[in-house]
Amino acid sequence: MNPQLSPKAIREIREGTCNPLGAPQVTTDLSENIILTSLDDLHNWARLSSLWPLLYGTACCFIEFAALIGSRFDFDRFGLVPRSSPRQADLLIVAGTVTMKMAPALVRLYEQMPEPKYVIAMGACTITGGMFSADSTTAVRGVDKLIPVDLYLPGCPPRPEAIFDAVIKLRKKVGNESILEREKTEQTHRYITYKHEMNLVFSQNTGEYLNKTSTNVFPSSKKEKITELPENREQTEIINSEEE
C-alpha cells in the first residue's frame, strides 16, 4: 500500500474492496422521520391498542367492571371501547356465574366474535363456580368447560385495579403473537383436558335422628328437678310469696 495516501483515502479503498456497492447513505432528516419495524409488530400494536370488550355480566362481578367506565378509573385510556354486539368485539370478559341455561348463549356469542378473539374469566364464580359449586345443580363449574380462556382473574369480586392488570397482561400476550404462527398457537379446543372432580356426598338431613330413642327419652336425672308449672297468675303469686 502506498504510504503517501491519506488515512481517508485508505479507508475509502478498504470500503470499496469489502463492499463494492458501498454503504447505504441515509440523511439525518430521513433517519429521524422513518421507523423501521415488522408487519407483526405493526399489526399487534394496532390490535393491542384497540381491544373492544363485549359487555357480558351475569352477577355481582360486573359491578366492578362497570366501575371502569366511570371517570374514576377511565378505561378508555387503554383503548377499551365497550360493545354490545359480538361481531364488533374481540375481547370477552365473562363476569359472574354462568348457569346451564346461559351456557348455550355464551357459546353462541363466542362463536359470533371475529378472529382473533380473547377471553378473560373474571371472578371465582366464573373460574370454578365459586360459592355455588358446593350445592348448586345449575351452576357451571368453570367457564373453561365451554369456551377457551386466555387469562384467569380470581377474586370475589376482583377490584378494578386487578382488571387493569389483567388487560395489561393480555396486551403483552397480543404483542408477542405472530401472523404466521397464529394458527399453530391459537386455542382450537373448547373443552379443557382435566375435570373438576366433585365427590358425591349423601345428605345427612334425612330426619332419621328424630326417630332415635335417645332423642325421645328424657333423662331420669333431670326429671326430678322439674316442677309442675303454675296454671294461672294467682298460683304464681302464691308461690312467690311463700318463697319470700
UniProtKB/Swiss-Prot annotation:
Residues covered by region (Disordered): 221-244
EC number per UniProt: 7.1.1.-
Cofactor comment text: Binds 1 [4Fe-4S] cluster.
Signal peptide extent: none
Enzyme class: translocase
Taxonomic superkingdom: Bacteria
Entry-linked Pfam families: Oxidored_q6
GO biological process terms on file: aerobic respiration; electron transport coupled proton transport; photosynthesis, light reaction
UniProt xrefs under PANTHER family: NADH DEHYDROGENASE, NADH DEHYDROGENASE [UBIQUINONE] IRON-SULFUR PROTEIN 7, MITOCHONDRIAL
Name of this chain's protein: NAD(P)H-quinone oxidoreductase subunit K
